[in-house]
């Protein structure tokens, strides 16, 4: 029994076990320490080698920096060259307009505009059709004035010119609306002769590409006739009994443009930036003048030496004079070259200032808006303005002995006040209910969400959301129905940043001097083709379905193209205030500008794409994908490289788009470069680089403008 019992461990044995365990622990700790020290030494050695390699690469980059920047400067001459071509085209256009003598004014000349406006004011008794025809000229002039304000580099725009152009725009807008009012009065005076045989009331629809007029005159005053629907449309009104029994006319003037909202302020560069650019230009001018004066001095010295030799030796005089003439001729040529260089330098600075302004974020948020007031920096009006008016029916034309007699009212067409200012004589509370209105959304406008109906507050000079109720929208029929407390201008608005931030983007070559820019958003995929100085909407996809737009297939210069896309509801163009309304991946403006300029330079032979790592690097750096793209076969098997660019340094990253974590580590066997051009040159074919060097300057400038306008690196 005692043998079955467990043997008792003695104190000495227990101490021995503890000692062995302690020795084992100390040995393991020592081994771990030695292993850690070894690993740490290896890590530090690797770090030292990497640091040395990094410093060597930095030194090499610094050594060739000036050379690379000089080469980039020569390539970037395409931007001032494109600007010079644009200016020459503008002058040629002005000259053609001058020799045409077609009677239309030059919108940039105040005297011509004032004469045009005065002459049209004097013209009376124009029919609606005549005003519509004239409106085409007026709208074209307004468009030209807006383009002048947008296309002229900010440094070249003087305050007095801005005021002049904006005043001309406002005068034309006001006069055009006044003319439509007078033409409506002339039309309504003939209401009785245009009456419908069935209803006895007058109904008229006049359609044009820019304006649509719907007018209804209540001649019979039938209290049961309260539903007004214009023929072959669902557009109309449900009017209350009091209006159905009154001498009134209801007018819906749908202008496919917005002349009600205030004009957008013209962006101008900050004083600090303007002064910096001015100083740069002044320095260049001084340097050039010094160089020219030095040459003149040298020429005069040569002439003095020549005259001295004349006195000594007549034979040598002729030879010396010949030499002097040659030298003077070459000096003149050099002087001309210096002047040309100075002009290009000034143009280059002007273009750079304008480009930087496109990516500048405003430091101040737009003024505070009270409840129900629309902030037009956050929202945009779409589809034009619907001018809704209840008018007093003017005296009708009456046939008397072969003559048409009509009473002419001095005050002209009068609006019918509804509801009246005093309602004491009316007993029932709901004697003046809101008027139900049904409108058709313009066919060329895309709403990604149900449109919001707003009304114009003439007193406060802004759009408001109150006073409108029971709004419903039928997307298939494109009809919006709502109830309106009082008549006046109404419009439809949409969040201006509904397609921002973008989900992804890609820029790839299509042909010689032709690229395709694809921007993918939550709601749509927009494809834009760019060639020479033109842009075209290639396609729109809505929820994987192709959408047909009137803009597709139409080539336009960049600024009119951007305006057309915005007016169609396809806004992928941030403003200087957009960062207040969109969560963005903000980048330093100068880094953005440098990246877009150099991407544009390479765009004829290289494709660029969105990278998720651009979100994880700081605001002083941008990351994007790039690959050589000479044939469509490149699209099938894309082999993207990841580049990081800080404006002063470009490097190829070791990580891939599919990697798990972000790292700025350099890809093996690659180097730093001061420009993107020299970075891609390391892995590009000679054919690709030759294609880049022979790119059309207008094409490069257009691609750059589109990149600056979409701000893909900050808004993706």
From Swiss-Prot:
Transmembrane segments: none annotated. The keyword Ubl conjugation applies. GO terms for cellular component: axonemal dynein complex; axoneme; cilium. Pfam families: Casc1_C (PF12366), Casc1_N (PF15927). Keywords: Cell projection, Cytoplasm, Ubl conjugation. It is found in: Cell projection, Cilium; Cytoplasm. Ubiquitinated. Ubiquitination leads to its degradation through the 26S proteasome. Ubiquitin-proteasome-mediated DNAI7 degradation occurs in mitosis. The keyword Cytoplasm applies. Its main location: other. GO terms for molecular function: beta-tubulin binding; microtubule binding. It comes from the Eukaryota. PANTHER family: DYNEIN AXONEMAL INTERMEDIATE CHAIN 7 (PTHR20929:SF11), LUNG ADENOMA SUSCEPTIBILITY 1-RELATED (PTHR20929). Belongs to the DNAI7 family. Part of the multisubunit axonemal dynein complex formed at least of two heavy chains and a number of intermediate and light chains. Interacts with tubulin. Associates with microtubule. Via its association with the multisubunit axonemal dynein complex, is potentially involved in the regulation of cilia function. May also act as a cell cycle regulator. This is Dynein axonemal intermediate chain 7.
């Amino acid at each position: 029994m005692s043998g079955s019992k467990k043997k008792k461990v003695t104190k000495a044995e227990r101490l021995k076990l503890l000692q062995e365990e302690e020795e084992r622990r100390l040995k393991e700790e020592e081994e771990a320490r030695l292993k850690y020290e070894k690993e740490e030494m290896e890590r530090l050695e690797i770090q030292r080698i990497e640091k040395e390699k990094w410093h060597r690469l930095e030194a090499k980059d610094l050594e060739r920096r000036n050379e690379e920047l000089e080469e980039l400067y020569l390539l970037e001459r395409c931007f001032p060259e494109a600007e010079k071509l644009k200016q020459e085209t503008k002058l040629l256009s002005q000259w053609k307009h001058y020799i045409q003598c077609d009677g239309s004014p030059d919108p940039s000349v105040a005297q011509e505009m004032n004469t045009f406006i005065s002459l049209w004011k004097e013209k009376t008794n124009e029919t609606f059709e005549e005003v519509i025809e004239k409106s085409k000229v007026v709208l074209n002039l307004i468009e030209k004035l807006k383009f002048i304000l947008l296309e002229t580099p900010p440094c070249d725009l003087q305050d007095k010119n801005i005021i002049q152009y904006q005043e001309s725009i406002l005068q034309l807008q006001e006069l055009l609306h006044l003319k439509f009012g007078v033409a409506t009065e002339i039309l309504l005076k003939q209401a009785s002769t245009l009456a419908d045989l069935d209803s006895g009331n007058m109904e008229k629809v006049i359609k044009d590409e820019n304006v649509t007029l719907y007018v209804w005159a209540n001649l019979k005053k039938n209290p049961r006739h309260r539903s007004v629907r214009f023929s072959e449309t669902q557009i109309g009104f449900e009017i209350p009994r009091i209006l159905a029994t009154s001498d009134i006319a209801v007018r819906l003037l749908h202008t496919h443009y917005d002349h009600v909202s205030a004009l957008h302020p013209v962006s101008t560069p900050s004083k600090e930036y303007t002064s910096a650019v001015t100083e740069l230009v002044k320095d260049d001018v001084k340097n050039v003048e010094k160089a020219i004066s030095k040459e003149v001095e040298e020429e005069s010295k040569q002439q003095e030496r020549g005259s001295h030799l004349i006195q000594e030796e007549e034979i040598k005089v002729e030879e010396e004079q010949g030499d002097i003439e040659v030298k003077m001729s070459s000096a003149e040529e050099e002087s001309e070259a210096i002047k040309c260089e100075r002009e290009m330098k000034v143009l280059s600075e002007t273009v750079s200032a304008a480009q930087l302004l496109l990516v500048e974020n405003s430091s101040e948020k737009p003024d505070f808006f009270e409840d129900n007031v629309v902030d037009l920096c956050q929202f945009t009006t779409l589809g034009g303005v619907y001018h809704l008016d209840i008018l007093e029916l003017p005296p009708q034309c009456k046939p008397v002995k072969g003559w048409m007699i009509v009473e002419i009212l001095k005050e002209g067409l009068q609006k019918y006040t509804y509801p009246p200012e005093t309602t004491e004589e009316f007993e029932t509370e709901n004697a003046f209910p809101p008027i139900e209105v049904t409108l058709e959304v313009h066919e060329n406008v895309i709403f990604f969400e149900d449109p919001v109906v707003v009304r114009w507050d003439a007193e406060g000079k802004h759009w408001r959301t109150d006073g409108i109720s029971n709004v419903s929208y039928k997307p298939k029929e494109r009809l919006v129905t709502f109830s309106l407390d009082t008549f006046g201008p109404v419009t439809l608005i949409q969040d201006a940043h509904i397609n921002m931030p973008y989900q992804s983007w890609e820029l790839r070559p299509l042909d010689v001097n032709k690229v395709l820019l694809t921007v993918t958003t939550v709601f749509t995929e927009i494809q834009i083709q760019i060639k020479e100085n033109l842009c075209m909407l290639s396609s729109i996809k809505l929820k994987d379905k192709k959408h047909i737009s009137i803009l597709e297939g139409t080539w336009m210069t960049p600024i009119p193209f951007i305006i057309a896309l915005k007016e169609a509801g396809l806004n992928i163009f941030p403003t200087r205030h957009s960062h207040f309304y969109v969560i963005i991946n903000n980048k330093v403006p100068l880094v953005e500008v440098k990246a877009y300029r150099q991407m544009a330079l390479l765009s004829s032979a290289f494709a660029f794409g969105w990278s998720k790592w651009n979100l994880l690097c700081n605001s002083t750096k941008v990351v994007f994908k790039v690959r050589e793209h000479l044939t469509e076969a490149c699209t099938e098997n894309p082999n993207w490289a990841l580049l990081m660019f800080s404006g002063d340094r470009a490097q190829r990253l070791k990580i891939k788009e599919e990697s798990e974590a972000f790292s700025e580590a350099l890809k093996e066997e690659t180097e730093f470069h001061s420009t993107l051009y020299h970075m891609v040159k390391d892995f590009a074919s000679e054919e690709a680089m030759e294609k880049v060097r022979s790119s059309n300057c207008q094409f490069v400038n257009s691609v750059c403008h589109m990149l600056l306008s979409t701000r893909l690196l900050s808004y993706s």
